[in-house]
């Protein structure tokens, strides 16, 4: 009769082998490659922080962007900024946070961050916030 320990080892080996062969891929790895492609397609320079050398730089901690001409609502800015902060924490690349905030959050990186942070179910709420601050 097969011992319990041997049977358990066999079950573990089968499960690991089936997961390895099924092509399971982590969401963060897939999202990271999509974010890299998105950021590289929008920039003509190979340097990720090259846009910061323009006349207005945006610090990572700045909540209110003076270029935003819409209604100033601190709660909305904090909510939108939180998406960029969480996206930065997901990818750990400073240019993700700064690019996410460009154009008063009305950009494809912000939209990708919403998708990667699984916030698509409340997308309308965030789009409304972007339209409010960026008019």
UniProtKB/Swiss-Prot annotation:
Signal sequence interval, chain numbering: 1-26
Tissue specificity statement from the Swiss-Prot or TrEMBL entry: Produced by the medulla terminalis X-organ in the eyestalks and transported to the sinus gland where they are stored and released.
Molecular function via GO: neuropeptide hormone activity
Origin superkingdom: Eukaryota
GO BP: any one term: circadian rhythm
Cellular component, GO, one term: extracellular region
PTM sites of type Valine amide: 133
Functional note: Hormone found in the sinus gland of isopods and decapods which controls the blood sugar level. Has a secretagogue action over the amylase released from the midgut gland. May act as a stress hormone and may be involved in the control of molting and reproduction.
Protein name: Crustacean hyperglycemic hormones A
Gene label: CHHA
């Amino acid at each position: 009769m097969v011992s319990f320990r041997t049977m358990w080892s066999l079950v573990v080996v089968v499960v690991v082998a089936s997961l390895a062969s099924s092509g399971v891929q982590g969401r963060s790895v897939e999202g990271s490659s999509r974010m890299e492609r998105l950021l590289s397609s929008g920039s003509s320079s190979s340097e990720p922080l090259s846009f910061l050398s323009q006349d207005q730089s945006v610090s990572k901690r700045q909540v209110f962007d003076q270029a935003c001409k819409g209604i100033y609502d601190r709660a909305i800015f904090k909510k939108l900024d939180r998406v960029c902060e969480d996206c930065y924490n997901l990818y750990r690349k400073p240019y993700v946070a700064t690019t996410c905030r460009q154009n008063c959050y009305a950009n494809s990186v912000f939209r990708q961050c919403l998708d990667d942070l699984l916030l698509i179910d409340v997308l309308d709420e965030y789009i409304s916030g972007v339209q409010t601050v960026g008019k």
